[in-house]
């Protein structure tokens, strides 16, 4: 039989597995919310540890927290930050919308670990109380939103942005590699005028660069913290200067710039900065979806498709068709992007649900946001390393496309006019002939004139 200890809260005693640091409220949550498999993200757990450590420092400086107790809280919180106590955070996302159970999970774990460090008995709440000491000057209503913002900023800065920059670097390398390869452009999926393959890839690189810049643009708003607003934004039970001190301590702990939100009522009741930031992530997903689609279609074939690109062959593609290889990295990335579009819809709705002084969709917002960051970062790296860096041009196919294109007739607009050029192109298409044959045979140009005007290399920029 598993050994237990008795923990208590305002509802009375409850048994908790003896080797677990959580207490009564986390235990009740395990029983009350048996919903799904989605646990609190590790980045949120880490962020809760950061908040508790920063609050302990601020409380020792401003609220008279006993240094012995405060130092023990700081030490225990550091273990949470370092991921040493992650197994003691078992709660699911689907709980109270304020994240109260997860805040109390952190309070209880840090309390019991600090008690253990001080030689006390877990479950006694002495000498470190989860509410009176670990949660001192705080409410779940400002603590969980603060942890959300910390986690989101850290994951964007340390995971998503480096991944997108990695992809951007690889695309820029392809721009250089393909700069002299002239191909036919396509608009409305139909043949258009020429451009270089490098120019086409420069569009992809520019999209990723814009995505990076747009996400970075959202970080200042996301770096404003609710901590210090306590229950409804008034700062009740927090000392003067607590909000500013906590933001300062969080900045020191993370090495990132955080500030206290100028209006705590807004910080508790709305999460517009989360919606704004995820909107930029959603736009990045839209950009990567387009890029992945273009690349897989340009690589279609190998004999009956567009066949302009040769994509890396990473694994067998079919259980029934021998030798088949598929554009799996594009498929994985576009699935991720589609999922992010769904997350964005959920976040947008959740952001609108700040009823009066508190938004109560916090855990779901944090989970979806962080999932998007994780997935897009992972997928961008996978797509870069397993696809983009190995892309090669199939120059023979590209050349044939240029030679057969009817849209080269656009180069004759200035010489012959739109209507005659349209007639030449349509006649060539109908007869299965070339532009040269119809232009020269129809008496519009000589062979020499055709060669003078229809030069793809002169059609890839302003003249």
Swiss-Prot record:
Q: In which pathway does it act?
A: Carbohydrate metabolism; tricarboxylic acid cycle; (S)-malate from fumarate: step 1/1
Task: List where in the cell it is found.
Answer: Cytoplasm
Q: Name one GO cellular component term.
A: cytoplasm
Enumerate the UniProt keywords alphabetically.
Cytoplasm, Lyase, Tricarboxylic acid cycle
**Where along this sequence does the record place binding of substrate?**
98-100, 129-132, 139-141, 187, 319, 324-326
PROSITE patterns for this protein: FUMARATE_LYASES (PS00163)
**Highest taxon of source:** Bacteria
Q: Where is the active site?
A: 188 (proton donor/acceptor), 318
User: What EC number(s) has UniProt assigned to this enzyme?
Assistant: 4.2.1.2
In this entry, which stretches build a coiled coil?
none
| Positions bearing the site annotation: Important for catalytic activity | 331
- For the protein in the UniProt heading, the enzyme class is lyase
The entry lists its GO molecular-function terms as: fumarate hydratase activity
Q: Which Pfam families match?
A: FumaraseC_C (PF10415), Lyase_1 (PF00206)
Main localisation, per the record?
cytoplasm
Q: Which family does it belong to?
A: Belongs to the class-II fumarase/aspartase family. Fumarase subfamily.
Q: What else is known?
A: There are 2 substrate-binding sites: the catalytic A site, and the non-catalytic B site that may play a role in the transfer of substrate or product between the active site and the solvent. Alternatively, the B site may bind allosteric effectors.
Q: How does it assemble?
A: Homotetramer.
- Protein name from the UniProt record: Fumarate hydratase class II
